Amino acid sequence: MKLSAEGLKDRAKWEEAGYALPKFDREKVTEATKENPFWIHFGAGNIFRAFQANVVQNLLNDGILDRGLIVAEGFDYEIVEKMNHPHDDYTILVTLKADGNIEKTVVGSVVESLTVNTENASDFARLKEIFAKDSLQMVTFTITEKGYSLVNGKGELLSDVEADFVSGPEAPKSYIGKVAALLYARYQAGEKPVAMVSMDNCSHNGDKLYAAIHTFAEKWEENKLTDAGFRAYVNCKEKVTFPWTMIDKITPRPDASVEELLKKDGIEELDPVITSKNTYVAPFVNAEECEYLVIEDAFPNGRPELEKGGLMFTERETVDKVEKMKVCTCLNPLHTALAVFGCLLGYEKISDEMKDEELKKLVETIGYKEGLPVVVNPGVLDPKEFIDTVLQVRVPNPFMPDTPQRIATDTSQKLAIRFGETIKAYAASDELDVKDLKLIPLVFAGWLRYLMGVDDSGKAFDLSPDPLLTTVCPYVADLKLEEGQDVESAVSEVLKMKQIFGVDLYEAGLAELVCGYLKEMTKAPGAVRETLKKYV
């Protein structure tokens, strides 16, 4: 059994092995899509293959759509060359359910794949042709938050971007430069309307995409490299929009145990490829069953009925509320709490932590008792139900190979938004008292204990990458697992850092509590567990 148009001709064999196959006429859909494309997506990675492509497949199966997707890859061309083309753009989606069941789907809704490479003349000409089509309604992106940045870590323009500003839209080298050049082709074809939709997992993502594209339009116009009206076109909401979205679905890298499962079914040529850009890609993707995509409904050229595939369309303010609900209360804070204590207690899978009574109670209390009273309720999703799903379905899912070590990455950048907003909301409330927060301060103390790089049994471990490690680790460098230390003197400066906690913990009235917890957790090996038992 081979994953290709030829290999899928023997449908009975695939169906016998438990695979759901496309139910539509793919040749007909391919022809219609190439002639009148409505949706092109940039970023041929796992999230797109597991989420957007599957939504479109379901709508094609139900006869709601008659055209599929075109995908373009601009960061790593080998994904298209080594994965899409050899498999005729088919993907196997393995949905790993919390109840132990596995769903296997052959996704065939992607019918054309291209590289966003100006040196590949035929691909780039085809992209320009797609962008000039009246039928094009939406251009979507999963290129990571970094993909929208025109500067490096020091704030200096990236060299490709700088070169593109002066060479213009003919043959740009930078990713956003190429996208801007394609949008310029649409402008030249008659200022045709389109929605440019970032679907990356970052706050106000549409603004990030707009800022990057607008900068190119501005520079090119200043340097007289485009027609004078291009910038006005990018700025005209009746013609080009940059909707905000909130996406949530975990798609870990292809897992070896899933690969074995598919091999047992008799599927050949499943080997993952590690590209020269270090992308780990396979003919299959594995993902959790839960998925959320909330989109600001701003589509100047119309859009298909994607809500019939489970996507939610609403106004910008609601997208923002959903984002805040997830990031500040209902998912991300719970992940961080489990990450910090998971590393300290020697866990290697997040799902295993939900079998730990103290840790389970810790996140339940942070979510339901401390977070929910101040949650931003978006209306389109119920916050309590969202937490229910996180704690009962998503995090305990044994098939999701997520680790506390991965989630602990960059914790210093996450605490302010994930916990600081709740503290501020308590401080601003007439009914609530910051001093009622008992377990959020415990997570802060847990993080400081984590920075010692010694687990609860006294064994050293590697800290996950974090840009502030060199800043904060020296404060805990002299702490040991023994009684009688002056913990507060060691960490008082850190507790004042608003950029880490979102507030000065002394001003908020929580510093004493954090120091007390940290003192208890550094008494001896085993003290982290004892502290959890005592306070959770």
State each model region's role.
Residues 1-42, 46-536:
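Substrate/ligand-engaging "lid" and interaction regions
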